[in-house]
C-alpha cells in the first residue's frame, strides 16, 4: 500500500515540488517524482526564484519582472507526469504509464495494444487511493456538501472503458470520453496544486521584522536588551497543552507494533489532531504558533517521514521535559539566527532592498573574502616561522611583531627566506624585510575582516608599509613608527628581478622536464610564435575548465578506443601515447601541458569563434549518433554573441542541478563528458591549426638545445603590485590556485573597468608566484648546518643504516640528497609535528624490509599484465564472474599497490602527503574561525545598533566582566561618527556601558564568550604547528564545533569536513556515537577507501592508501 506525501521545498536555491510515497509492503519511502521549478530553462531562459521581504516570484535570469503565471503554465506538462506517478504505484509498468499519460495529454498518445493492458491485473498497478472509491470536491463547488461530492472508482472505470474498446489498438477519442471522470479529477488536482505552489512561492519571502515571526523575534530581542527573559517555556507549554499532547503521542507510540514503519505517520497525525483542537489559539497567539512550529520540527527530526531507511524513534524524545529542553534551545537559536541575518543585512547596508539577488551577491563576496582571510592566515603563519616560530599570539599585531625581534635568529631567518625567495638577503636587511612582509599581509587582513564592500584597489595596490622601532628621545625610550614606500626599498629590485626572469624560468622548467632533450630550438620557437601569442601568467579566465591531465587522458581514450565498441569519434590525432615511464613521452606530455595552460586556455576561453566551433562540433556529432543522441539533448547550443565564460557558467549550473539527485547521476556524467569533449576537441584543433603536431613525435637531441629560444612576454604589472606579490610568495601552490579560482569566479560579477583591470593584474601576480613558488633547495647545505644535523633529521624518517645509500645519499655514499618532502615540511612549518609523529614508533621509519619490497618483482611487468587483463575484461565483461580469473586480477593489483606504497614510503612521499593533510585540516579549521569572526561582527553590531550605540566592532574583541580593555585597535572597534579616533572605554563611559550590555546579551544567548575566543585564536594562528599547544588535531575540531555551537548546521559541518578531507586523501573515517563520548569526536574506524575495478559491483578492489598509512594518520589526529 502506498501513502503519498506532498511537499514544496526550497533547497540550495532551487525550488522543487516533491512526491514522496511510502510502500507498506516493502516498508520504505521512495521519492517518486521531483519536479524542479527553478534553475531550469523555459523558452531557453533560466528560471529563478526572486525573494524579498514582501514575498517570492518566479523570474527569468537577468530580469526582475514577475513571470510566475507564465512559467507555471509552461510547467504544466510536469504536473501531468506527477499525476501519472500519483496514479500508477509501480513506475516500472510502462504500458500503464503510457495509457494514463495519453489520457492527460494528447501529444503523448502512443499506439497501445488493448490486449497489452487488459491482460494485466489493473488494480495491482494503481496507487492505494485508487484501489477503492475516491471522493473529491471540484474547485468551483459552492461548498463541501454531499451534493457536490464526486466519486471515482478508477479500477472499475478502467476495466469498463477498456471492455468498450473494439479494435486492436486503443482508440483515444472514445477511450478519453469514457474516462472523462478521471480526466476531470486530474485537471482539478493539477489546478489546485498549481494554486498551492503559487501560494507557496508568494509566501517564500525573506524573513523580516514585519513578518509574524519577525515581530515575535523583535519582541524577544527587546526583552533580552531590557534584561528580561524573552519567553517562559513552562508558561507557553501550559497554554499549548503540551502535557496533553505528549500523553497522546506516547500512547500512539506504545500502541504501535514493534518495528511499525508507519508509526511516524501516526505520530504526525496525532499532532495534527492536537493542532485542530487549538487552531484558534494558534491563529491569535504568535508565540504559541511559533512554539507549535518548533514542535513540528522536533517530530520531523526525531520521527521523520521523508527519510529513506529511517529507524523507529526513541520514546524518550516524546517526554515533556525533553521536548521543552529542545524547543527552548531551538527558540534561542532562532533568535540568534535572526540576529545574524539582520546583522548581515545591516553590515551590507541592504536592509530595505534585500532580495534573493542581493543575498546571492553577498554569498559570492563572502566566499571570496573568507578564502582571502584563509590565505592571510596561512601567509602570517609562514611569516611567524621566519621571525618567531613559537609566538602564540597574533604575529601581525604591530606591538607583538616589534617584540618578536628580541627572539629572532638571523641564520634561521635567512634559511627560511631562501625557501620562499630567489633573491638573497643580508643580515642588515632582515628587519626591514620582515616589516615589509608584515605590511603586505596585515592591511589586507585588517580590511577584509570587515566583511563589507571592500576597496579592492586598496587590497591589491598597497604602496606603503610601517616600521615601529624603539628610540631614545630626550633621554626617554619611545616607540616611533615610520612609513616606507615599497618602490623605494629592496622589494622593488626583488619584484622586477623575478619579472625579468620569467622567460628564463620557463626555459628552466622545460629543461627539468626534458623538453630541451627532445625538441629543437626551432620547434620550440614555433610554439612561441603562434599568432597573437604572448606568454600569459593568467591561464584561463573561465572557472571549471578541465585540467590538462583530464583532457589528455580522456583524449587518449577517445582516440584509441576499441573499434568494436566505439564511443565518440571526435576525429582526434594528437593523443597518441600514454607511456609515463618513458622519458620521451614525459617531454611530449610536459610540452603539451605548457601549451595547454600558457597558450591554449587563454585564447580558447576568450575567443568566441574558436570555442563555439568546438561546441557545435560536439553537439552535431552527438545528434548524428544513432541510439546515443539523447546524451547531450538537454544541452543547448552556444549563442552567437555569447562569451565562453558565460556558456561555461550555464553548463556548470546545469551540472550542479543534478548532482544532488541519485536518479540523475547519469546526467551528471553527460554534462561532465560534454565539458571534457569540448576542451579535448578544442585543444586538438588548436594544435593542428597551428601546425604543432610534431610535438607528438619527440626525437632525442644529440645535445640539449637551450640557445636561441625566444619567449615573448609582456605584463602590465608595476610598482603597485609589489606588496601583493610579497604576500603571494608566502603561500603554497594549493593556496594560490584556490585563491585564483575564487578570484576568477568573483571577478565575473565585476562591472567597473578599473576593478576588472585591478583583478586581472592581481591574477597575474598569482601566476608569477606560482611560476617560481615551489622551487626547491639545490644544495643540502641550504637546509642543514652540517652532515650531523642532516643525519639527525633524516634518522627520524629513515633507519640509520640506510642513510649512506641511495636514495638518501649520492652514489658516493657521502653526499646527502635533498628530499623534496623534507624541504617542504621545513618551509611551511609542519616539521615539528611530523618529527614528533615519526618519533612515536620505529615502525613508521623506512627499513631494509621496505627497500626489499621494491625489488621483489618487476612492477612494469605487473602493470602490463593488469592492462592486458583489463583489456580482456572490456572484450568479455563476463570474466568478472569467473572466480579464477578475478583472483588472478586481484593478485596483480595487490602486487602493484604494495610496490606503490613501499615506493611512497621509501622516497618519503608519504611525509609530503602527511604535510599536505595537516595543512588541509588546519586551513579548514581556520576557515571556520573566519566564519565565527564574521558572525561575531554581525551579531555584535546588530545588538549595538539596537542599543543606539555609536560604536561598531570589526573583529572578535574580548568582553570581560572584571577587566575591560581600555584601548582597541582601529581594526577591532571604531566610532561611527569619527572612524579615525582611537577608541578607549577609559575615556568614554558610554562605550563601557555599551560593551557591558553587549557582553550580557551575548552571555544570555550563549554566544562568543572569552573561553571560545582563546580556542579561536589557537586555531586561527596555527598554534598547533609550534608543538606547544597541548591539543590534538581531533581536539581542535572539537574546539571548532564548540565555537560554532550557535549554529547547528555549521557545528555539524565541522565533523563532516573532517570526513571529506580524509576522503580526499584516500581514507574513510567513522566516529563513535557522540552520546558515548560526551560529545567529543572519537575515531571508531579509519581505513583505506576502496577503488573498485571491473565495475562497482565487482569484488575486485584495491585500497587507495595502505593500512600502515591509515595508522600514521590516526596517530597524527590524536597526537598531542
Swiss-Prot record:
Task: Report residue spans for region: HEPN-like fold 1.
Answer: 354-496
Q: Its Gene Ontology biological processes?
A: defense response to virus
Cofactor note from UniProt? Pre-crRNA processing is metal independent, while crRNA-guided target RNA cleavage is dependent on divalent metal.
Name the enzyme's class. Answer: hydrolase
UniProt region (HEPN-like fold 2), positions on chain: 908-1120
Molecular function GO labels: endonuclease activity; RNA binding
Q: What is its EC number?
A: 3.1.-.-
Q: What else is known?
A: Part of a type VI uridine-preferring CRISPR-Cas system.
**Domain text:** The target ssRNase active sites are probably within the 2 HEPN-like folds, and the 2 folds interact in vivo.
The molecule here is called: CRISPR-associated endoribonuclease Cas13a
Please name the source species: Listeria seeligeri serovar 1/2b (strain ATCC 35967 / DSM 20751 / CCM 3970 / CCUG 15530 / CIP 100100 / LMG 11386 / NCTC 11856 / SLCC 3954 / 1120)
Q: Coding gene? A: cas13
Amino acid at each position: 500500500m502506498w501513502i503519498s506525501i506532498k511537499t514544496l521545498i526550497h533547497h540550495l536555491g532551487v525550488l522543487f515540488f516533491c512526491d514522496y510515497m511510502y510502500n507498506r509492503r516493502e516498508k520504505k519511502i521512495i521519492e517518486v517524482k521531483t519536479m524542479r521549478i527553478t534553475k531550469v530553462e523555459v523558452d531557453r531562459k533560466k528560471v529563478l526564484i526572486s525573494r524579498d521581504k514582501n514575498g517570492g516570484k518566479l523570474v527569468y535570469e537577468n530580469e526582475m519582472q514577475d513571470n510566475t503565471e507564465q512559467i507555471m503554465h509552461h510547467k504544466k506538462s510536469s504536473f501531468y507526469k506527477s499525476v501519472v506517478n500519483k496514479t500508477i504505484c509501480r513506475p516500472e509498468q510502462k504500458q500503464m504509464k503510457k495509457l494514463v499519460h495519453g489520457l492527460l495529454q494528447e501529444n503523448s498518445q502512443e499506439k497501445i495494444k488493448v490486449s497489452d493492458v487488459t491482460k494485466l491485473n489493473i488494480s495491482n498497478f494503481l496507487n492505494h487511493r485508487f484501489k477503492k472509491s475516491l471522493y473529491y470536491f471540484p474547485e468551483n463547488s459552492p461548498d463541501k456538501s454531499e451534493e457536490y461530492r464526486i466519486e471515482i472508482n478508477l479500477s472499475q472505470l478502467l476495466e469498463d472503458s477498456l471492455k468498450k474498446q473494439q479494435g486492436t489498438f486503443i482508440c483515444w477519442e472514445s477511450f478519453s470520453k469514457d474516462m472523462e471522470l478521471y480526466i476531470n479529477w486530474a485537471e482539478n488536482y493539477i489546478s489546485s496544486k498549481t494554486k498551492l505552489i503559487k501560494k507557496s512561492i508568494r509566501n517564500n519571502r525573506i524573513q523580516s521584522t514585519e513578518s509574524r515571526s519577525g515581530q515575535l523575534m523583535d519582541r524577544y530581542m527587546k526583552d533580552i536588551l531590557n534584561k528580561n527573559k524573552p519567553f517562559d517555556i513552562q508558561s507557553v507549554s501550559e497554554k499549548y497543552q503540551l502535557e496533553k499532547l505528549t500523553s497522546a503521542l506516547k500512547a500512539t507510540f506504545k500502541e504501535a507494533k514493534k518495528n511499525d514503519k508507519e508509526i511516524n505517520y501516526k505520530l504526525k497525525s496525532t499532532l495534527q489532531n492536537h493542532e485542530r483542537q487549538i487552531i484558534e489559539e494558534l491563529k491569535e497567539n504568535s508565540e504559541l504558533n511559533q512554539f507549535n512550529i518548533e514542535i513540528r520540527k522536533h517530530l520531523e527530526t526525531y520521527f521523520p517521514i521523508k527519510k529513506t531507511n529511517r529507524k523507529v524513534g526513541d520514546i524518550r524524545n516524546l517526554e515533556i521535559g525533553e521536548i521543552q529542553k529542545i524547543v527552548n534551545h531551538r527558540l534561542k537559536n532562532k533568535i540568534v539566527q535572526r540576529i545574524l541575518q539582520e546583522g548581515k543585512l545591516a553590515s551590507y547596508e541592504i536592509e530595505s532592498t534585500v532580495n534573493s539577488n542581493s543575498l546571492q551577491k553577498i554569498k559570492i563576496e563572502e566566499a571570496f573574502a573568507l578564502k582571502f582571510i584563509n590565505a592571510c592566515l596561512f601567509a602570517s603563519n609562514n611569516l611567524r616561522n621566519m621571525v618567531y616560530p613559537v609566538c602564540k599570539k597574533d604575529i601581525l599585531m604591530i606591538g607583538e611583531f616589534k617584540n618578536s625581534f628580541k627572539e629572532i635568529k638571523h641564520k634561521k631567518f635567512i634559511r627560511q627566506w631562501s625557501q620562499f625567495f630567489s633573491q638573497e638577503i643580508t643580515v642588515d636587511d632582515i628587519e626591514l624585510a620582515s616589516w615589509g612582509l608584515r605590511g603586505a599581509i596585515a592591511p589586507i587582513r585588517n580590511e577584509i575582516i570587515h566583511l563589507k564592500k571592500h576597496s579592492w584597489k586598496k587590497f591589491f595596490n598597497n604602496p606603503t608599509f610601517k616600521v615601529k622601532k624603539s628610540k631614545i628621545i630626550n633621554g626617554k625610550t619611545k616607540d616611533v613608527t615610520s612609513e616606507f614606500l615599497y618602490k623605494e626599498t629592496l622589494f622593488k629590485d626583488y619584484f622586477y628581478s623575478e619579472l625579468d626572469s620569467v622567460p628564463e624560468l620557463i626555459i628552466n622548467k622545460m629543461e627539468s622536464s626534458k623538453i630541451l632533450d627532445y625538441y629543437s630550438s626551432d620547434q620550440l620557437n614555433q610554439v612561441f610564435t603562434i599568432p597573437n601569442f604572448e606568454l600569459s601568467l593568467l591561464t584561463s579566465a573561465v572557472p571549471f575548465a578541465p585540467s590538462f591531465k583530464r583532457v589528455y587522458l580522456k583524449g587518449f581514450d577517445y582516440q584509441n578506443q576499441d573499434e568494436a565498441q566505439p564511443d565518440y569519434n571526435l576525429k582526434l590525432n594528437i593523443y597518441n601515447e600514454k607511456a609515463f615511464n618513458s622519458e620521451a613521452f614525459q617531454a611530449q606530455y610536459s610540452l603539451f601541458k605548457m601549451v595547454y595552460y600558457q597558450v591554449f586556455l587563454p585564447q580558447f576561453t576568450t575567443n568566441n569563434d574558436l570555442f563555439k566551433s568546438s561546441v557545435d562540433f560536439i553537439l552535431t556529432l552527438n545528434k548524428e549518433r544513432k541510439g546515443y543522441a539523447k546524451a547531450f539533448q538537454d544541452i543547448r547550443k552556444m549563442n552567437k554573441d555569447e562569451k565562453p565564460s558565460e556558456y561555461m557558467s550555464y553548463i556548470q549550473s546545469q551540472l550542479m542541478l543534478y548532482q544532488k539527485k541519485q536518479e540523475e547521476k547519469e546526467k551528471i556524467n553527460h554534462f561532465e563528458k560534454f565539458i571534457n569533449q569540448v576542451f579535448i576537441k578544442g585543444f586538438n584543433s588548436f594544435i593542428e591549426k597551428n601546425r604543432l603536431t610534431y610535438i607528438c613525435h619527440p626525437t632525442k637531441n644529440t645535445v640539449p638545445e637551450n640557445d636561441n629560444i625566444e619567449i615573448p612576454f609582456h605584463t602590465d604589472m608595476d610598482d603597485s603590485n609589489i606588496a601583493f606579490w610579497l604576500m603571494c610568495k608566502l603561500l603554497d601552490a594549493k593556496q594560490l590556485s584556490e585563491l585564483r579560482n575564487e578570484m576568477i569566479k568573483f571577478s565575473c560579477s565585476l562591472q567597473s573597468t578599473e576593478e576588472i583591470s585591478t583583478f586581472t593584474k592581481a591574477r597575474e601576480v598569482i601566476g608569477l608566484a606560482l611560476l617560481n613558488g615551489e622551487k626547491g633547495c639545490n644544495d643540502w647545505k641550504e637546509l642543514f648546518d652540517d652532515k650531523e644535523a642532516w643525519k639527525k633529521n633524516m634518522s627520524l624518517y629513515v633507519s640509520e643504516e640506510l642513510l649512506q645509500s641511495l636514495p638518501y645519499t649520492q652514489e658516493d655514499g657521502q653526499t646527502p640528497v635533498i628530499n623534496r618532502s623534507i624541504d617542504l615540511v621545513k618551509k611551511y612549518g609542519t616539521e615539528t609535528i611530523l618529527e614528533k609523529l615519526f618519533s612515536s614508533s620505529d615502525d613508521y621509519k623506512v627499513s631494509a624490509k621496505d627497500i626489499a619490497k621494491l625489488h621483489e618483482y618487476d612492477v612494469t611487468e605487473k602493470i602490463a599484465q593488469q592492462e592486458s587483463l583489463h583489456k580482456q575484461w572490456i572484450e568479455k565483461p563476463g570474466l568478472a564472474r569467473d572466480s579464477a580469473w578475478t583472483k588472478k586480477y586481484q593478485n596483480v593489483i595487490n602486487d602493484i599497490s604494495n610496490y606503490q606504497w613501499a615506493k611512497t614510503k621509501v622516497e618519503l612521499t608519504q611525509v609530503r602527503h602527511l604535510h599536505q593533510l595537516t595543512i588541509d585540516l588546519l586551513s579548514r579549521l581556520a576557515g571556520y574561525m573566519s566564519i565565527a569572526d564574521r558572525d561575531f561582527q554581525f551579531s555584535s553590531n546588530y545588538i549595538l545598533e539596537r542599543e543606539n550605540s555609536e560604536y561598531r566592532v570589526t573583529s572578535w574583541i574580548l568582553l570581560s566582566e572584571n577587566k575591560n580593555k581600555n584601548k582597541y585597535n582601529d581594526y577591532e572597534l571604531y566610532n561611527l561618527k569619527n572612524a579615525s579616533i582611537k577608541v578607549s572605554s577609559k575615556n568614554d563611559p558610554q562605550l563601557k556601558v555599551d560593551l557591558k550590555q553587549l557582553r550580557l546579551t551575548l552571555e544570555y544567548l550563549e554566544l562568543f564568550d572569552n573561553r571560545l575566543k582563546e580556542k579561536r585564536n589557537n586555531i586561527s594562528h596555527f598554534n598547533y604547528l609550534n608543538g606547544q599547544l597541548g591539543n590534538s588535531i581531533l581536539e581542535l575540531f572539537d574546539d571548532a564545533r564548540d565555537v560554532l555551537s550557535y549554529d547547528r548546521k555549521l557545528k555539524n559541518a565541522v565533523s563532516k569536513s573532517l570526513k571529506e578531507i580524509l576522503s580526499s586523501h584516500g581514507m574513510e573515517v567513522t566516529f563513535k556515537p557522540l552520546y558515548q563520548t560526551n560529545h567529543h569526536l572519537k575515531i571508531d574506524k579509519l581505513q583505506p577507501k576502496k577503488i573498485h575495478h571491473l565495475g562497482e559491483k565487482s569484488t575486485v578492489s584495491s585500497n587507495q592508501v595502505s593500512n600502515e598509512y591509515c595508522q600514521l594518520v590516526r596517530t597524527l589526529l590524536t597526537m598531542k
